Amino acid sequence: MSDIPAGDYEKGKKVYKQRCLQCHVVDSTATKTGPTLHGVIGRTSGTVSGFDYSAANKNKGVVWTKETLFEYLLNPKKYIPGTKMVFAGLKKADERADLIKYIEVESAKSL
């Protein structure tokens, strides 16, 4: 099993609002500066229809799981060199786990 903390939905919601909401949505399939995060778990990188990804994101071919998101969110530019995402990352493991929990719960909701 993974070493990812369980995550807290409410704390993750706060992290999302502070660090992600400016560029991403999780409650629709729309894109903003970044692609929708709704349904990201289980999706292959660079595949949201209508979003203009960098070649790096398209070519990475990673399937987003809790584990891959946990690693990615630590340092996006290290995980996918050449990504257009300007976010520096979340250094605290608990914040990454909380954010993943929030995205997971919100993605389970019907649109």
Swiss-Prot record:
Heme c binds at residues 20, 23-24, 85. Transmembrane segments: none annotated. GO terms for biological process: electron transport chain; mitochondrial electron transport, cytochrome c to oxygen; mitochondrial electron transport, ubiquinol to cytochrome c. It comes from the Eukaryota. GO terms for cellular component: mitochondrial intermembrane space; respiratory chain complex. The modification N-acetylserine is found at residue 2. Coiled coil: none annotated. Binds 1 heme c group covalently per subunit. InterPro entries: Cyt_c-like_dom, Cyt_c-like_dom_sf, Cyt_c_1A/1B. PROSITE patterns: CYTC. The keyword Amino-acid biosynthesis does not apply. It is found in: Mitochondrion intermembrane space. Its main location: mitochondrion. One of its GO terms (molecular function) is metal ion binding. It holds the Pfam family Cytochrom_C. Keywords: Acetylation, Electron transport, Heme, Iron, Metal-binding, Mitochondrion, Respiratory chain, Transport. Electron carrier protein. The oxidized form of the cytochrome c heme group can accept an electron from the heme group of the cytochrome c1 subunit of cytochrome reductase. Cytochrome c then transfers this electron to the cytochrome oxidase complex, the final protein carrier in the mitochondrial electron-transport chain. Belongs to the cytochrome c family. This is Cytochrome c 2.1. It comes from Caenorhabditis elegans. The lineage of its organism: Eukaryota, Metazoa, Ecdysozoa, Nematoda, Chromadorea. The gene is cyc-2.1.
